[in-house]
């Protein structure tokens, strides 16, 4: 079902990163009511730029580390709900690409995403009288087919795809729909700085960047298109400036 972002309230976790900031710029052009950015490090210049793009949109920043205990996330969301009354869309975008940091990669890329999602269900779940909502989780094409030199990162992104697909199937129960946007190799600082697991390929970043990539802006534009298409359960591939829905192959069925 197509979705208009006009006059909506969007919470964007990691909305000041490479792809995140470009996506935030595209979002404010859609005449949101509120864009609430949750990120580890405040960037006043970026916030000012977002406000200047469209002064009609209220842009707010809260410091947030996705690795905090879930109770802290719930407390922060309670503050935001008290301020806005409603949240229409949650974008989970926190991510690191550093297979030297195994525990942190899992904590940021997967556990933090699960905890943030779980926390907002306290407010959205229709079984608790909530209004429902929309969750957009940022995965990666490595969630489909791993970059085998970064198996920890790739594994977390595969987990994001499966978790989100499960959320989508639970929508009739919770009232919360979900989908993933999965960028291909995009020219950001994240790609330039990452390390391979156990240094199995010291030049993994250079080798990846030798192949065709996409600019962050092209990825961001398709990101917002995916939000507007609003297809529950969709697995979007955002690669080389294109937007494509992936058809996931079923190899097993739980039968329940």
Curated annotation (Swiss-Prot):
Effect in UniProt of substituting residue 213 to N: In strain: Gif-sur-Yvette stock 115
A GO molecular-function descriptor: protein homodimerization activity
Active site feature: 153
Gene Ontology cellular component terms for the protein in this record: cytosol
Pfam family, one: adh_short
Keyword match Glycosyltransferase: no
GO-annotated biological processes: acetaldehyde metabolic process; acetyl-CoA biosynthetic process from ethanol; alcohol catabolic process; behavioral response to ethanol; NADH metabolic process
Residues annotated for NAD(+) binding in this entry: 12-35
Effect of residue 233 to R: In strain: Gif-sur-Yvette stock 115
Result, substituting residue 211 to Q: In strain: Gif-sur-Yvette stock 115
Binding site for substrate: 140
InterPro entries: ADH_Drosophila-type, NAD(P)-bd_dom_sf, Sc_DH/Rdtase_CS, SDR_fam
Keywords annotated in UniProt: NAD, Oxidoreductase
Catalytic activity from the UniProt record: a primary alcohol + NAD(+) = an aldehyde + NADH + H(+); a secondary alcohol + NAD(+) = a ketone + NADH + H(+)
EC number: 1.1.1.1
EC primary class: oxidoreductase
Family, similarity comment: Belongs to the short-chain dehydrogenases/reductases (SDR) family.
PANTHER family: ALCOHOL DEHYDROGENASE (PTHR42901:SF1)
Quaternary assembly: Homodimer.
Protein name: Alcohol dehydrogenase
Encoding gene, per UniProt annotation: Adh
């Amino acid at each position: 079902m197509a979705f208009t972002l006009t006059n909506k309230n969007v919470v964007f976790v990691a909305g000041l990163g490479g792809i995140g900031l470009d996506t935030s710029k595209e979002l404010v052009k859609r005449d949101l009511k509120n864009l609430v950015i949750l990120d580890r490090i405040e960037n006043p210049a970026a916030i000012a730029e977002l406000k200047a793009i469209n002064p009609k949109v209220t842009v707010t920043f809260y410091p947030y580390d996705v690795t905090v205990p879930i109770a802290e996330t719930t407390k922060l969301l309670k503050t935001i709900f008290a301020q806005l009354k409603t949240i229409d869309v949650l974008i989970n975008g926190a991510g690191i690409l550093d297979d030297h940091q195994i525990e942190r990669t899992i904590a940021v890329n997967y556990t933090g995403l699960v905890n943030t999602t779980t926390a907002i269900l306290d407010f959205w779940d229709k079984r608790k009288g909530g209004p429902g909502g929309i969750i957009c989780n940022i995965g990666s094409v490595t969630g489909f087919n791993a970059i085998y030199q970064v198996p920890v990162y790739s594994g977390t992104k595969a987990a994001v795809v499966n978790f989100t697909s499960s959320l989508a199937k639970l929508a009739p129960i919770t009232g919360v729909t979900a989908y993933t946007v999965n960028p291909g190799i995009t020219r950001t600082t994240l790609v330039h700085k990452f390390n391979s697991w156990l240094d199995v390929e010291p030049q993994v970043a250079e080798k990846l960047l030798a192949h065709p990539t996409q600019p962050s802006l092209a990825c961001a534009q398709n990101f917002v298109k995916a939000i507007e298409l609003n297809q529950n359960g969709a697995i979007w591939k955002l690669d080389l400036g294109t937007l494509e829905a992936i058809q996931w192959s079923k190899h097993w069925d739980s039968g329940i």
